[in-house]
Amino acid sequence: MRRLALLIVCAVMPFLAQAGETVPNTLDEAFAALDQLLPPEDRHAFKMATEEKAITRGHMAIGLYIRNEWFRSGKSKLSGKLREAGARSLDDASSMVLTSYWRHLNSKPINLKEQGECYTKWWTEQQRLEKEARAKGENGYGTPTFSCP
């Protein structure tokens, strides 16, 4: 697992220094960019993993690249579109891109609205747990018992 993440990070690093890099503004553009960024063997490994494993493994590798280079740079309109769909954080947004990419590679319905609704539900539950813990005078609180997607 860690080897795949490391391979993906190493494969992507040369692209970080490219000047004038075009960032995607749509999911289709993101898919095309990921097709270019990921070597065929990494793309194949991502596709062949289960959806959950692919997203988990990719989160701190290609997901980190997506967050830093596409979203934090402010150059891409895609993060705003994902926020409109329900992403509440850049982690949510990059996970939605990775989930959508995995589904695209595997010819599955992307269901972006459903993905966004899950994140909205997750954050609502997180806020409820925080409020409940504060009301009890507790310093800590749990996280929702489900993950997205």
Model regions and ranges:
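Hydrophobic h-region of N-terminal signal peptides that target proteins for export
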Residues: 10-18
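N-terminal secretory signal peptides
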Residues: 19-57
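Compact alpha-helical subdomains of small soluble proteins
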Residues: 45, 49-146
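Positively charged n-region of N-terminal signal peptides that target proteins for export
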Residues: 1-4
